[in-house]
Design a protein with these regions (language model features):
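Alpha-helical transmembrane segments and their immediate juxtamembrane cytosolic regions
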Residues: 2-413
């Protein structure tokens, strides 16, 4: 196992099956959460489409094995840049992975109770483990081949020689899938050892879930306790890697906190409390939206000061870590409020929701090839990113909708 400084682009969710709706509020809730997961998938596509044109993207590489290895996060680097993409990428990076771990946890407890640990893990191995193997073995080399081409080299043989000599092989966005599978394994083992642990967690969160401010405070301080010590010990951009398994070292416990809190909210009753359509969170969406913007601005200001500060690195590291967790929680609460309050069934959004997992799995290869194809185009960074984003969304959506017509594929993704 090794540790790398690669600032990998963070990514997304399990897309577990939603429970069968039993009443109108449950139907509306399922629509809201399903649409929110699909929306974050779209944010992931926009995030990756913009990275080639990020103002601080690294210089084009000369070899896949050259150090530092920044190409896993930036497979293609364009000469065209736009400063606004630093805001988009920074905003996404503060919250969307954490929110997706929270959403992934919502239905875990009911699934464990219904299936038991064995059947639950078999289902997760099928829905998460198998796609990860395919993504790491097939889709990742396809996505990173343009990085090799940008070095000026040609030919699959040369690419393969450099690829197998790496020692650690990035799986692209699929890193999220294996981490989620690991978290599911933790939940299943706990269920075998302590069968009521989710119910206890649900009872602890039941009252705070009806008071969004209280729940927000719990989320901030629990995640800060998990994140800040790790960020002080490890560089916040550091990734631990072994083989095809990557995870962001300082955030792994932070993500686990969001996942476990999601389990607790799901155990407490997903259609009531925090995520009720007529609840306090949904009714207060304007305040949460404004608070999210303020918290992100505060986190950005602290980050700028912290990276230029010459003194008190632990103080600024602590402040930076706290404002990160503050912004993360505020943005997550804001998007939950907006979707629970306003999401209504639409056929096109239903299609996006149904195909979102597959879109997530295959989009990275499409992004990198479109970025590579546009390298010599006489277009601005904004124009290129827009073409890459819309092209990736359309192509991946069409492709997944087509292959999901095969029943076995539809059961998998």
């Amino acid at each position: 196992m090794s540790v790398t400084q690669t600032p990998f682009a963070p990514l997304r969710n399990e897309y577990a099956s939603l429970p069968e709706p039993g009443n109108t509020s449950q139907i509306q809730y399922n629509v809201a959460i399903g649409y929110l997961r699909a929306f974050v998938t779209v944010l992931v596509l926009a995030h990756h489409a913009a990275l080639a044109y990020h103002p601080f993207a690294p210089a084009p590489l000369t070899s896949l094995i050259a150090e530092p290895r920044l190409w896993p996060a930036f497979p293609v680097v364009d000469a065209q840049r736009w400063s606004g993409f630093s805001v988009l990428v920074g905003f996404n990076d503060t919250f969307f992975m954490s929110l997706m771990f929270f959403l992934s946890g919502l239905f875990v407890w009911k699934s464990l109770q219904r299936k038991g640990s064995g059947a639950f893990l078999r289902n997760r191995m099928f829905r998460l483990g198998l796609p990860f193997v395919v993504a790491a073995a097939c889709l990742a080399p396809l996505a990173y081949y343009p990085a090799y081409l940008q070095t000026g080299h040609q030919g699959l043989a040369g690419f393969w020689l450099q690829w197998i000599s790496l020692g650690n092989w990035p799986a692209g966005p699929a890193w999220f899938v294996w981490v989620l599978l690991a978290f599911d394994c933790i939940a299943a083992v706990l269920f075998m050892l302590i069968p009521k642990w989710g119910d206890v967690l649900g009872r602890l969160l039941s009252r705070p879930s009806r008071r969004p401010i209280t729940f927000f405070a719990i989320l901030v301080f629990a995640s800060a306790a998990a994140y800040i010590p790790m960020a002080l010990v490890f560089n916040p951009f550091r990734w631990t890697v072994f083989g095809p398994f990557f995870f962001q070292t300082s955030r792994i416990l932070h993500y686990l906190v969001y996942f476990l809190i999601g389990i607790g909210i799901g155990a407490a009753s997903v259609e009531r409390g925090l995520l009720a359509r007529d609840g306090k969170l949904a009714r207060g969406w304007p305040l949460w939206a404004g608070g999210a913007l303020f918290a992100f601005g505060l986190a950005g200001a602290v980050f700028i000061v912290a990276i230029s500060a010459q003194n008190s690195p632990y103080l600024w590291g602590t402040l930076g870590g706290f404002t990160f967790t503050l912004s993360c929680a505020a943005s997550s609460m804001a998007f939950l409020a907006l979707f629970v309050r306003f999401a209504k069934p639409r056929k096109i959004f239903d299609s996006l929701r149904e195909n979102a997992y597959g879109i997530y799995l295959i989009h990275y290869a499409i992004v990198s090839w479109l970025q590579y194809a546009l390298l010599k185009a006489q277009l601005s960074a904004i124009e290129k990113a827009f073409i890459v984003f819309t092209g990736t969304l359309a192509l991946s959506w069409i492709a997944i909708a087509a292959i999901r017509r095969v029943p076995a594929v539809a059961r998998l993704i």
